[in-house]
Amino acid sequence: MRIEKCYFCSSPIYPGHGIQFVRNDSTVFKFCRSRCNKLFKKKKNPRKLRFTKAARRARGKELINDATQLLEQRRDEPVKYERAMFQKTIEAAKTISALKTKRYGNLIRKRLQPGKIVQKKGLLAKVDKKMHLIRAPVANRDGVKTRAAAKEKKTAESMETN
């Protein structure tokens, strides 16, 4: 069973599904759904449409130049059937898929990290501004007074420098 890739969006096309478009110069284009076929005929750029793999790669949301993707490349050479070899490839495919999901998770974590840092800084700034709502004015008056004095001193220094 050969699983093809859609020419437009790169999603898998299983046997008995999809549309084939053959141009006059005998190049074959395979599409997974009518949406991809229509957009191809309208000469739309797949990198500019958000649902395609090309667009996801361009925006950094998919793995690029990963060794696990080399194994998905199409090979047109027929291979003689050997049971042991096919069992090894099935085992390798399982380990590769596990590795691929792990790497994809790491990619997502790396992409989210800067946003989390910014969010944390914003929350800390909000806490500093609204400290009077968090801490009761009667409790720990010395700490509040010293902080207030320090803030006044900072504002006075900044005014002097300007």
Curated annotation (Swiss-Prot):
The keyword Nucleus applies. One of its GO terms (cellular component) is nucleolus. It holds the Pfam family Ribosomal_L24e. GO terms for molecular function: structural constituent of ribosome. One of its GO terms (biological process) is ribosomal large subunit biogenesis. Belongs to the eukaryotic ribosomal protein eL24 family. PANTHER family: 60S RIBOSOMAL PROTEIN L24, RIBOSOME BIOGENESIS PROTEIN RLP24-RELATED. This is Probable ribosome biogenesis protein RLP24. It comes from Caenorhabditis elegans. The lineage of its organism: Eukaryota, Metazoa, Ecdysozoa, Nematoda, Chromadorea. The gene is rsl-24D1.
